[in-house]
């Protein structure tokens, strides 16, 4: 049985399409230094659209790796790293330089997709993380809980998703 819903994300020009199946692990905004640097790196590409919000945060939806796939245009995807030896890849659709998702060379069992790439019924934001790194003088909205680092709620959601993967749910 296929978990529902199925959400589709596309690059700005429509040449790359991603599919995420089932309930996401979490929908969050990250303010860490690496996400801010990564957003600037991608935004500096020719014709790239905005990646970070005006307050410096980057909105993501996290999905289990086993429920996330590129269904169109995989040959157009290119990884960008902040440092050559970094395990973190910010994946961009080269056709229009749209930020698509973040994955890792090793480690985490999840994929961090850029929330702005999704269409239709997009899950609402649930929390803001790593807010201690937000730009100086930035006032954050109080629409969802905020945490200076990685809150226990996020860690629990990640652990629950991993257990569900291990037992085949």
Predicted regions and their residues:
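A short Gly-Trp-Pro
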Residues: 1-10, 16-169
């Amino acid at each position: 049985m296929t978990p529902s819903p199925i959400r589709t994300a596309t690059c700005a020009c429509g040449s790359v399409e991603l599919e995420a199946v089932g309930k996401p692990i979490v929908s969050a905004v990250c303010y860490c230094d690496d996400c801010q640097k990564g957003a600037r790196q991608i935004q500096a590409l020719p014709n790239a659209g905005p990646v970070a919000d005006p307050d410096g945060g980057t909105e993501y939806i996290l999905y289990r790796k086993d429920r996330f796939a590129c269904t169109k245009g995989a040959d157009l995807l290119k990884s960008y790293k902040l440092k050559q030896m970094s395990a973190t890849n910010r994946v961009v659709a080269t056709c229009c330089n749209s930020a698509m998702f973040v994955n890792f060379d090793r480690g985490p069992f999840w994929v961090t997709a850029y929330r702005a790439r999704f269409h239709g019924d997009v899950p609402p934001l649930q929390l803001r993380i790593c807010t201690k790194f937000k730009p100086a003088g930035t006032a954050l909205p109080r629409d969802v809980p905020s945490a200076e680092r990685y809150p226990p709620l996020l860690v629990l959601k990640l652990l629950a998703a991993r257990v569900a993967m291990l037992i085949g749910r």
